[in-house]
């Protein structure tokens, strides 16, 4: 289990370095999706399967709006990819910073103890995160609908803002 968590956390670091080091929004969005997947995999490793599914859907909804906005504003015919030298230098700087912080925190890293959600419920039928689902749909159902509506509205607002004087992404039929 510890190897799974280690690999997932290293994947999260690699994905975040891919987001931070790339100037083109197309490849940065791919790194952001990868980071969201491995971050939710980290939550699954600690027993939060439903929570990771909900967060993954929220991440994808928010990233759709951000990607539409950034791709419409920064449309480049030849974007820089992960193979260019400037991106490679940024990755080396971020990797050096990560190793420096890891070396600094190595002495007291194991003073904290992380527990799974299922540690205290050995005889429970439900896992730790699934027991909160009825609260989301009973008292938080209206807020869930409002959140979905706001995400859809934000997508249309971004598409209209980036349209400008040209025809843009939303075309009148």
UniProtKB/Swiss-Prot annotation:
User: InterPro entries from the entry?
Assistant: ComplexI_Subunit6, NADH_UbQ/plastoQ_OxRdtase_su6, Nuo/plastoQ_OxRdtase_6_NuoJ
What disulfide bonds does the UniProt entry report for this chain? none
Q: How does the protein associate with the membrane? A: Multi-pass membrane protein
Quote the catalytic activity from the record: a ubiquinone + NADH + 5 H(+)(in) = a ubiquinol + NAD(+) + 4 H(+)(out)
> According to the UniProt entry, what is the EC number of this protein?
7.1.1.2
Which major enzyme category is it? translocase
Location(s), subcellular? Mitochondrion membrane
GO CC terms, sorted: mitochondrial membrane
Keyword set, alphabetical order: Electron transport, Membrane, Mitochondrion, NAD, Respiratory chain, Translocase, Transmembrane, Transmembrane helix, Transport, Ubiquinone
Which coarse location class applies to the principal site listed for this UniProt protein?
Answer: mitochondrion
Molecular function terms in GO for this entry? NADH dehydrogenase (ubiquinone) activity
Q: Which residues cross the membrane?
A: 1-21, 27-47, 53-73, 82-102, 106-126, 141-161
Q: Which family does it belong to?
A: Belongs to the complex I subunit 6 family.
This molecule's function is given as:
Core subunit of the mitochondrial membrane respiratory chain NADH dehydrogenase (Complex I) that is believed to belong to the minimal assembly required for catalysis. Complex I functions in the transfer of electrons from NADH to the respiratory chain. The immediate electron acceptor for the enzyme is believed to be ubiquinone.
PANTHER family, from UniProt? NADH UBIQUINONE OXIDOREDUCTASE SUBUNIT ND6, NADH-UBIQUINONE OXIDOREDUCTASE CHAIN 6
Name used for this protein in its record: NADH-ubiquinone oxidoreductase chain 6
What gene name is listed for this protein? MT-ND6
């Amino acid at each position: 289990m510890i190897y799974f968590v280690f690999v997932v956390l290293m994947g999260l670091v690699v994905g975040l370095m891919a987001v931070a080091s790339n100037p083109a929004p197309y490849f940065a969005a791919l790194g952001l999706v990868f980071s969201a997947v491995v971050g939710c995999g980290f939550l699954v490793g600690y027993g939060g399967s439903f929570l990771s599914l909900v967060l993954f859907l929220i991440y994808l909804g928010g990233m759709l709006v951000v990607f539409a906005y950034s791709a419409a504003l920064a449309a480049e015919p030849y974007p820089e990819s992960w193979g260019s030298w400037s991106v490679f230098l940024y990755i080396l700087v971020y990797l050096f910073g990560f190793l420096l912080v890891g070396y600094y925190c190595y002495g007291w890293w194991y003073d904290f103890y992380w527990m799974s959600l299922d540690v205290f419920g050995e005889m429970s039928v439900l896992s730790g995160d699934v027991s909160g689902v009825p609260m989301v749909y009973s008292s938080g159902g209206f807020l869930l609908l409002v959140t979905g509506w706001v995400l859809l509205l934000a997508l249309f607002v971004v598409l209209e803002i980036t349209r400008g004087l040209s025809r843009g992404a939303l075309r009148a039929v």
